[in-house]
Structure formats: structure tokens, C-alpha cells
Amino acid sequence: MKSYFMQPLRGTKDILPNEINYWHHIHDKALTILSLHNYSEIRTPIIESTSLFKRSIGETSDIINKEMYTFTDQGDRSITLRPEATASIARAFISNKLYHSNIQRLWYLGPMFRYERPQSGRQRQFHQLGIECIGSINPMADTEVIHLANQLLKELQVKNYILEINSIGTLEERQSYKLDLVEYLSQYQQDLDQDSKNRMYSNPLRILDSKNLKTQEILDGAPKLKKYLNKRSTEHFYLVCTYLNNLNITYKINYKLVRGLDYYNQTAFEIKTNSKNSQNTICGGGRYDTLIEQLGGPKTPAVGWAIGIERLLKIIEDKLILPKQKINVYIATQGLAAQKKIWEIIQALEKKNIKFELDLSNTSFHKQIKKAGKLGAKFCIILGDQEIMDNCVTIKRLDEYVQYTAQYSNFLQEIHKLQH
């Protein structure tokens, strides 16, 4: 009988040592690029009050209605594992009074949780890398964050992706548009797919990104959101596009693009690969100028994005050739006296930052040296009863098949040579 409790939960995955180098690579590239633009890393708790997400993401969203991991704790509080990070960062901005400083440029990388049907590129525990530029209404901020996403993807060798961008205007502009959109769609209600019917009166804007071909045909004749934007919204979007042109960033204006979270306004964007996989959106973001005020903070404009790490890895894993993690030194010992003395050598290796592995098998020297070769070590330090008697150390250079003996005190003085 299969031991289900010994398997990871459905929609979760162990990240094994042979995979973790890719994660480190992404983190290091993000740190380098974002630090250059003065973005600082922030880490928020993975659990938050459920009300935070209900107030920010929107009561009618799929995340709130179907996907949140929510439980009541021992203090009878409703707690949720974060389904996304922007709301948590907005909460941190308020609770830590970060609004007393100038513009906050923040970035994060961590796990998120949504109860979704697991499939390729979609898990119930997944990871996002994201940035938030908080405190500026300037369209240059929108352009900066998009530019950083573009820079990071280029550095990670992502090819053949397209930036889609739109303006979804202000809340007031969208309200006017929603009324006319619902009026138009109600004429074709019987022909809409079931998801779109369900969204008609709760979240009609989400119908715009329906994957159903019949629904998309109906939408071709629907009112266009861009005609409802006022002069200020139109000018903001025009400047974002102008700055992207200045940066030679290719983009496509997609007037049907809307984001699935209620807090977005003005600029909305997604970066998609040319994969036929339905999960081909690897980055999504936009402006959220009312969220912080809505959560009880001061009126504060902001813009940001998030990249799905698992989706990103599916694209770059085969293209990235990362250096194998090898050790310089393998330490082979036999006998209690040698195993007492070896700790002085270990401390000397540590002081010189020489990467090593201590054999813990108590097997023969032959087997220990064979293990050193398999690990790709350059040197094998051998310390046994004979070496203890002669007050020396045997060093085997594995890549040159050379072995020599050194007096113990001389060896410690010249241990730095094992770095090469």
C-alpha cells in the first residue's frame, strides 16, 4: 500500500540540492540588477489576517472565492497563507510607517499559496519574485519597473517573450465602462461561456480575457475601455509608452488586458512567452494607487510586478549552464588518533575559506579516495595511524595522480596551496 503521507502534498514540490543552484542564480541576478537601481529586499510573514486579502484583492475575485488557504487559529483569528505579496507589502508599508521616508523601492522573493488545480507551471505552493515602487505617480515609475523586468529576463536568457500593456484607467472610469459592457454583453448572455456568465454581474472586466473563442468573437463588438479614459489617464499611458520607446523595449497594446486583482488602476501589463502552454504569462503587474489608502494608510501611489519562479525555471533550466559545485579538498581518516587530530586541519581549511568535505564512512582509504574522485575534489588529505606516528600528512593530488607527504607543521603553514 502506497504511503501517501510520505509524499509531498498535491501541488507542492521539494526543491532538491541539484535544483537549488538555479534558484540561487535567479536570486543573485535579481539582487545585482535591482540593487543597481537602489531597490532593497523586504521579507514579510507568509501568514496574514484574512481581512487583509479580502479588502485588497477583492471579494469577487477567484482568489478570494476559491483559492485561499484560510484557517482559524487557537486565538479564534481568521488567518490566510498569503496568495500574493503586494497586499502584505502594502500592510508592512503602513504598519512600519515607511511613508515617512521618500519613495520606497522594494523587492521580494518567497512562497505564495493558492488552492488551484495543479498543472504544468501552476502549483499550490509557488514562488514569486516581485518589486514594488511605492510613492510616485510619475509614469517614469511605471517605465522603470517594466524596464527592470525586461532587464532581468534578458540577464536570465529568456528568449521570445512579448510585453503586453494596457491602461485600465481609474476606478470611476472603469465603473462607467462596466455599466456599458454589461449592457452590451447581456444581449448575448446565452452565448457566453459559463465562467463569463458567472462574472457578468460580479466581475465583468475579467470577461475581457476569456479564453473562450465564442466569447472573444462577441467581445469584438463590445465597447472599448480606452474610450472611457479621461485626459489624465490617456496622457499617463501615452508617456509610459513613449518612455518604453525611448528604451527600445518592444511592446504590444492589448486593449483587452485586465489584471485579476481589484486593486489595479491605470497601467496594467503582462509578459508572455511564445509557449502554447496556457501558463505562458511569466510576469504580471501594474499600478495600484488606491490600495494603501484603502488599507488605512495615507494616499500613496505605487506600481509593481511579480514573476512566477516555477514558470520561469521551466523556460530557462535547459538553457542555463551553471558551474558545478565542486570541492577542493576531501578529508580521509582512519583510527581514533587521526580522527582527534583532524579537527585542527579542518579549522585551518575554514580560516582559508577552502571548500572541503570530511569523510564520515569509516571505510578503507581506497574507498574514501574513490569517493573523493567522484566528488571532483582536487586534493585528498589522508590522515591515518602511520601519519600520526610520523607526525605528517599525506596529500594526494587527484587530477594529476600525484601523492606526497608533508610534515604536519609545514603542511599547516602551506595549507593555502590547496585552494589551487
Curated annotation (Swiss-Prot):
The gene is hisS. It is an enzyme of class 6 (ligase). The keyword Chloroplast applies. The keyword Protein biosynthesis applies. GO terms for molecular function: ATP binding; histidine-tRNA ligase activity. Its EC number is 6.1.1.21. Belongs to the class-II aminoacyl-tRNA synthetase family. PANTHER family: HISTIDINE--TRNA LIGASE, MITOCHONDRIAL-RELATED, HISTIDYL-TRNA SYNTHETASE. It comes from the Eukaryota. This is Histidine--tRNA ligase, chloroplastic. GO terms for biological process: histidyl-tRNA aminoacylation. It comes from Gracilaria tenuistipitata var. liui. It catalyses: tRNA(His) + L-histidine + ATP = L-histidyl-tRNA(His) + AMP + diphosphate + H(+). One of its GO terms (cellular component) is chloroplast. It is found in: Plastid, Chloroplast. Its main location: plastid. Keywords: Aminoacyl-tRNA synthetase, ATP-binding, Chloroplast, Ligase, Nucleotide-binding, Plastid, Protein biosynthesis.
